[in-house]
Protein backbone atom coordinates (compact mmCIF):
# COMPACT_ATOMS: atom_id res chain seq x y z
CA UNK A 1 0.00 0.00 0.00
CA UNK A 2 1.39 3.35 -1.01
CA UNK A 3 1.02 6.16 1.41
CA UNK A 4 2.04 9.76 0.91
CA UNK A 5 4.69 9.31 3.59
CA UNK A 6 6.26 6.33 1.78
CA UNK A 7 6.25 8.20 -1.54
CA UNK A 8 7.84 11.19 0.15
CA UNK A 9 10.51 8.97 1.77
CA UNK A 10 11.33 7.35 -1.58
CA UNK A 11 11.58 10.73 -3.26
CA UNK A 12 13.87 12.00 -0.51
CA UNK A 13 16.05 8.88 -0.75
CA UNK A 14 16.46 9.33 -4.52
CA UNK A 15 17.18 13.04 -4.09
CA UNK A 16 19.77 12.29 -1.38
CA UNK A 17 21.45 9.66 -3.58
CA UNK A 18 21.63 12.06 -6.53
CA UNK A 19 22.90 14.88 -4.33
CA UNK A 20 25.64 12.69 -2.83
CA UNK A 21 26.76 11.37 -6.21
CA UNK A 22 26.98 14.81 -7.88
CA UNK A 23 30.63 15.40 -6.89
CA UNK A 24 31.56 12.24 -8.79
CA UNK A 25 30.29 13.76 -12.01
CA UNK A 26 31.02 17.47 -11.75
CA UNK A 27 34.22 18.32 -9.96
CA UNK A 28 35.23 21.93 -10.34
CA UNK A 29 38.66 23.32 -9.69
CA UNK A 30 39.10 27.02 -8.97
CA UNK A 31 42.52 28.59 -9.45
CA UNK A 32 43.12 32.08 -8.10
CA UNK A 33 44.95 34.28 -10.61
CA UNK A 34 45.24 37.48 -8.55
CA UNK A 35 49.02 37.48 -8.14
CA UNK A 36 51.79 38.68 -10.41
CA UNK A 37 50.10 40.66 -13.18
CA UNK A 38 51.91 43.24 -15.32
CA UNK A 39 50.27 46.66 -15.54
CA UNK A 40 50.94 49.55 -17.89
CA UNK A 41 48.96 52.38 -19.41
CA UNK A 42 48.09 51.94 -23.08
CA UNK A 43 50.20 54.96 -24.04
CA UNK A 44 53.30 53.36 -22.46
CA UNK A 45 54.59 51.31 -25.36
CA UNK A 46 58.28 51.11 -24.47
CA UNK A 47 59.48 47.74 -23.23
CA UNK A 48 59.94 47.59 -19.48
CA UNK A 49 57.35 50.28 -18.72
CA UNK A 50 55.05 47.84 -16.94
CA UNK A 51 54.93 47.33 -13.19
CA UNK A 52 54.11 44.17 -11.27
CA UNK A 53 50.77 44.30 -9.43
CA UNK A 54 48.47 41.98 -7.55
CA UNK A 55 44.73 42.19 -7.96
CA UNK A 56 42.59 43.93 -6.92
CA UNK A 57 44.48 47.00 -8.15
CA UNK A 58 43.71 50.56 -9.12
CA UNK A 59 46.14 52.95 -10.71
CA UNK A 60 44.84 56.21 -9.25
CA UNK A 61 44.34 55.55 -5.53
CA UNK A 62 47.03 58.09 -4.59
CA UNK A 63 45.87 60.86 -6.95
CA UNK A 64 43.58 62.51 -4.40
CA UNK A 65 46.47 62.62 -1.92
CA UNK A 66 48.94 64.19 -4.37
CA UNK A 67 47.46 67.68 -4.10
CA UNK A 68 46.58 67.81 -7.80
CA UNK A 69 43.07 68.71 -8.87
CA UNK A 70 42.82 66.01 -11.54
CA UNK A 71 43.27 62.25 -11.47
CA UNK A 72 44.66 59.75 -13.98
CA UNK A 73 42.27 58.52 -16.63
CA UNK A 74 42.75 56.42 -19.69
CA UNK A 75 43.18 52.81 -20.62
CA UNK A 76 45.16 50.40 -18.49
CA UNK A 77 46.48 47.03 -19.60
CA UNK A 78 46.71 44.09 -17.22
CA UNK A 79 48.66 41.14 -18.62
CA UNK A 80 49.43 37.69 -17.29
CA UNK A 81 50.84 34.43 -18.62
CA UNK A 82 48.99 31.25 -17.73
CA UNK A 83 50.12 27.69 -18.39
CA UNK A 84 47.20 25.50 -19.47
CA UNK A 85 47.83 21.90 -18.47
CA UNK A 86 47.42 19.28 -21.20
CA UNK A 87 45.20 17.14 -18.94
CA UNK A 88 42.63 19.96 -18.94
CA UNK A 89 41.83 19.26 -22.59
CA UNK A 90 38.23 18.10 -22.88
CA UNK A 91 37.18 20.16 -19.85
CA UNK A 92 35.47 23.52 -19.96
CA UNK A 93 37.61 26.46 -18.86
CA UNK A 94 36.32 29.82 -17.66
CA UNK A 95 37.81 33.13 -16.54
CA UNK A 96 35.78 34.72 -13.76
CA UNK A 97 36.28 38.31 -12.69
CA UNK A 98 34.93 39.75 -9.45
CA UNK A 99 34.72 43.18 -11.11
CA UNK A 100 36.55 45.57 -13.43
CA UNK A 101 35.77 49.25 -13.77
CA UNK A 102 34.19 50.33 -16.07
CA UNK A 103 34.68 48.73 -19.48
CA UNK A 104 36.84 45.61 -19.66
CA UNK A 105 37.92 43.96 -22.90
CA UNK A 106 39.40 40.50 -22.35
CA UNK A 107 41.85 38.86 -24.75
CA UNK A 108 43.31 35.36 -24.76
CA UNK A 109 46.39 34.92 -26.96
CA UNK A 110 45.60 38.25 -28.65
CA UNK A 111 42.06 37.16 -29.54
CA UNK A 112 39.20 39.22 -28.15
CA UNK A 113 36.89 36.94 -26.17
CA UNK A 114 34.51 39.46 -24.69
CA UNK A 115 33.65 42.83 -23.25
CA UNK A 116 32.10 43.68 -19.91
CA UNK A 117 30.50 47.01 -19.04
CA UNK A 118 29.91 47.97 -15.45
CA UNK A 119 32.05 48.50 -12.44
CA UNK A 120 31.32 46.20 -9.58
CA UNK A 121 29.55 43.12 -10.88
CA UNK A 122 31.23 39.78 -11.44
CA UNK A 123 31.44 38.41 -14.98
CA UNK A 124 32.61 35.22 -16.68
CA UNK A 125 33.99 34.29 -20.11
CA UNK A 126 34.43 30.76 -21.38
CA UNK A 127 37.95 30.29 -22.79
CA UNK A 128 37.83 26.58 -23.65
CA UNK A 129 38.22 27.06 -27.40
CA UNK A 130 40.73 29.91 -27.13
CA UNK A 131 43.62 28.35 -25.23
CA UNK A 132 46.62 26.27 -26.28
CA UNK A 133 46.90 23.17 -24.09
CA UNK A 134 50.32 22.26 -22.75
CA UNK A 135 51.57 25.80 -23.42
CA UNK A 136 51.73 29.20 -21.84
CA UNK A 137 48.83 31.44 -22.83
CA UNK A 138 48.51 35.20 -22.50
CA UNK A 139 45.65 37.00 -20.80
CA UNK A 140 45.14 40.70 -21.47
CA UNK A 141 42.48 42.78 -19.75
CA UNK A 142 42.19 46.28 -21.17
Predicted feature locations:
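Bacterial Sec-dependent N-terminal signal peptides
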Residues: 1-28
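Short non-domain terminal segments
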Residues: 15-17, 23, 37, 92-95
Amino acid sequence: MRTPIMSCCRLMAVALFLFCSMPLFAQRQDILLNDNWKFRFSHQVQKGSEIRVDLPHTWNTQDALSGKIDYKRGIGNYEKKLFIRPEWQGKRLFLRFEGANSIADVFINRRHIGEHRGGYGAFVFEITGEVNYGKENSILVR
